Amino acid sequence: MKNKLLKTTCAVFSLLSTALFALPQQLYAQSKEAYVEKNLNEKVMTFYYDNQKSSRKGIVYSINEKQKTESGLEIPAWSGNSQDGEKTTTKVVFDESFKDFHPISTDYWFAQYTVLKELKGIENLNTTDVTNMSHMFYHCDALPSVDLSHFNTEKVTDMNSMFSECTSLTSLNLSTFDTKNVTDMNSMFNFCAGLTSLNLSNFNTAKVKDMRAMFFCCTGLTSLDLSKFNTENVTDMGVMFFYCKGITSLNLSGFNTAKVTNMKGMFSGCSGLTSLDVSKFNTENVTTMNGMFASCTALTNLNLSGFNTANVTDMNGMFANCSELTALDLSNFNTINVTDMTSMFSACTVLAELKVPNFNTEKVTSMYGMFANSKALTSLDLSSFNTPEVTTMKGMFSGCSALTSLNISNFNTAKVTDMYGMFFNCEALPSLDLSHFDTENVTDMYSMFAYCKALKSLKVSSFDTKNVKNMSFMFFYCSSLPSLDLSGFNTENVTDMGAMFKYCLEMEKIDVSKFNTEKVTNMRGMFSGCRKITTLDFSNFNTDNVTNTNTMFFSCDAI
């Protein structure tokens, strides 16, 4: 009986002792928490997972503590804000204790740590459960390298801007990255200007939907192998390779672009590309090609015969500054939904042959600078162009200095308000018949025909100019033009006639007898250099508001 009682007592004591011993251990385990300490004096930030938070003497943040940006975005409390960035911390340390913590997100953890140069103990960052790495190293300007070889990324879905603006990074080893679940790679390497190479051969991009600006301004990259990229689910490739000026070739033969809607600026500024094969691109869902090939200054040819542009609405600057492109056949282009053709072929300086026979321009509202400075074009047949919605033709043919033939016979200009410099420096054009132009809504005709030195025939007698305010330099240096019929011009709202006929060297007669000049303030150099004019009728001129008549008749030797 005594032995039984003794055993029972011992057992109870043993259980009690175990419970009493376990209790503080459980309390200890429960009190562990993840947090960050900033030591401003030492310029170090340390990540811990322990129960010593209260004893830390630096600035301490709980791992889930947040701050709001001006836009309302919640980011870690220790992150750099959008205005100033974090300009103190030069070193980040992951304490060994932190390896037992499993974060589910590391988004914005080091965002805008602009002077951060070292990450120590990063192997203690356990990323097994992380799903979001968005903006993790965003704007870490001074970071020269980062070892991510231990990163487990198999659960990550978001890598948006992960290394964006890490301008000092010269190399990046992502060979261990598992990206099979990633859907967002938007701006992932944006502005990584120091990277000269990037091996992404192991990347699984099957689920990626967004590749917008992925390599934006990676100016140091000289090569990029994307032959294994699966892009079947990608919808956005806008500015994907923008200003990757060091890349000389791109193999995109495996790209599936069937779901892509945005190709805006996709290759813009790729000035090193000498060739580009996009013949297999499926563009049936693309709505914007704004600046798609702009400033591809080394491209000499481009085959777009397979492009389906039926849904495209924006072709603004699509080929602008393709300064080595000699010929372009866009006969297959369907432009029925395009509304913007601003600067579409601007500064294609050696483009001698351009085929646009089937362009439907009935929805286009802007043709501003569309062919500006296309200096090699000698003829342009735009007879298919119907322009009922166009409001601006400013500088449309400006600088087309080799143009001798221009067919714009079907232009509808009823809604055009701006013809500023429309034919500026079309110095080889011998004649222009604009008798069909409806200019009722035009307010600006500044330098409209300036430097059209070869013009010998110009039909503008039907122009309705009642709303025009600026006619300065309108016929400046039309040095071969013998006469002008402006008898129908209504100038009641014109305020500026400065240099309007300056250097019309062959002009013998200009009928300005019906000009209403009561609102004109500037007549500086208006007839300067009109050396063959013998008479001018100013009987209706009202110069009460004119403040400048300097050199108005300079070198008018025959008057």
Feature locations, PLM:
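Register-specific detector for alpha-helical tandem repeat solenoids, activating on a conserved position
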Residues: D107, S134-H135, N160-S161, N186-S187, ...
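N-terminal capping/linker segments that flank leucine-rich repeat
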Residues: K2-T128, N334, V356-N360, S384, ...
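Structural signature of tandem-repeat unit edges
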Residues: T88-F101, V115-T131, D141-T157, T167-T183, ...
